[in-house]
């Protein structure tokens, strides 16, 4: 009986294994490689070198004759203001409320030049102004541009008056407004208007 099981098992194995025989596939054909000649790059046609474009000119600032523009207003203020001779005056940097760039430093210098040796006011020097701005933590280039800042700075400098100026309207021909203010109260004691001259 053991023999018949062995024979039956062997026969069974032979049948199973005979069913697993697969078709043999042909190996993929091997193609011999041909040496490839290196491809020469196609020369690109020379591109024209772009010509430099002219640099556009920045818009020119309109030249305003600040001395001629501010002198009549300053003369009017000195005649009209009833102040004690020798009173200390802080000239605030002109505020630009025009529609463009304004030469604010030149305008402020023209106001200061017109006020020099007028007999009524002693001007705060630029050194004193820079020192006071530093003490208050303001940038040396800070244009105060507000009456409250200007009055606060004037109090720090022991000035009695502040001249607050504004340029308004078209930058080519701005309207100038000046206001002389009493530092102690902030009261405007004189105000004048004029048109800048080219």
UniProtKB/Swiss-Prot annotation:
Biased segments, Pro residues type: 38-59
Chief localization: membrane
Subcellular location per the Swiss-Prot or TrEMBL entry: Cell outer membrane
Listed GO MF terms: enzyme regulator activity
Lipid-modified residues, S-diacylglycerol cysteine kind: 20
GO CC annotations, alphabetized: periplasmic side of cell outer membrane
Biased composition (Low complexity): 26-37
Signal peptide: 1-19
Recorded superkingdom: Bacteria
Family affiliation: Belongs to the LpoB family.
Protein name: Penicillin-binding protein activator LpoB
Encoding gene per record: lpoB
